[in-house]
C-alpha cells in the first residue's frame, strides 16, 4: 500500500501524502476518501477503506468536481485540472516527464549511464507507446500547463511572458 509519496523530488504524486477529498458526481452522489493525483499517469487515486489498497478512480467522465480542502479539480478526459479561485478564472494542469529507473550496472549498483530513456507522458518522442510499470518509472521533472478564461474561452499559456500577451 502506497499511502505516502516517497521522495518529494521523484514522487509522481501531486501531494506529499494522500489527502481527504470529496468527489462530486454529475448524478448528485458524493464519494469521500483519501486521494492523490498522479501527474505521470494523469489519474486520481484513492485508498480503498475496505482493503486499504491504492486504486485508480474510474469513470472520470461521470465526475463533476473533486475537492481537496479548498482546492477544486475537474476532469477533462483522464486529466485532473485545478480551478484557481481568481478573477479571471485560471486553470492549472500538473504534468511531469518520466524516466526509467536506473539500470543495474557493475556489482548490481544502479547507474544512469548504462541506458536511460526519457519519456514525456506515456509516449516516447517518436510516438511509440510505452506501457509503464509505476514501480519502474520515476519523475524526471515537473511542469504545469495554464489556461485563463477570457470571453468564455480557455486560452493556454506556459509562462508569464505568454500570459502578458493575452
Label for each model-derived stretch:
Residues 1-10:
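Bacterial Sec-dependent N-terminal signal peptides
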Residues 34-161:
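Aromatic-patch recognition
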Residues 9-53:
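N-terminal secretory signal peptides
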Amino acid at each position: 500500500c502506497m499511502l505516502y509519496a516517497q521522495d518529494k523530488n521523484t514522487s509522481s504524486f501531486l501531494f506529499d501524502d494522500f489527502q481527504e477529498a470529496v468527489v462530486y458526481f454529475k448524478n448528485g452522489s458524493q464519494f469521500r476518501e483519501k486521494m492523490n493525483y498522479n501527474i505521470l499517469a494523469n489519474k486520481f487515486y484513492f485508498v480503498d477503506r475496505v482493503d486499504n489498497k491504492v486504486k485508480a478512480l474510474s469513470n472520470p467522465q461521470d465526475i463533476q468536481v473533486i475537492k481537496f480542502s479548498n482546492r477544486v479539480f475537474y476532469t477533462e478526459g483522464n486529466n485532473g485540472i485545478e480551478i484557481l479561485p481568481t478573477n479571471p478564472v485560471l486553470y492549472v494542469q500538473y504534468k511531469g516527464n518520466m524516466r526509467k529507473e536506473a539500470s543495474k550496472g557493475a556489482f548490481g549498483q544502479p547507474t544512469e549511464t548504462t541506458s536511460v530513456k526519457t519519456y514525456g507522458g506515456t509516449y516516447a518522442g517518436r510516438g511509440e507507446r510505452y506501457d509503464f510499470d509505476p514501480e519502474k518509472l520515476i519523475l524526471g521533472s515537473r511542469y504545469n500547463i495554464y489556461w485563463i478564461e477570457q470571453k468564455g474561452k480557455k486560452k493556454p499559456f506556459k509562462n508569464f511572458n505568454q500570459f502578458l500577451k493575452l
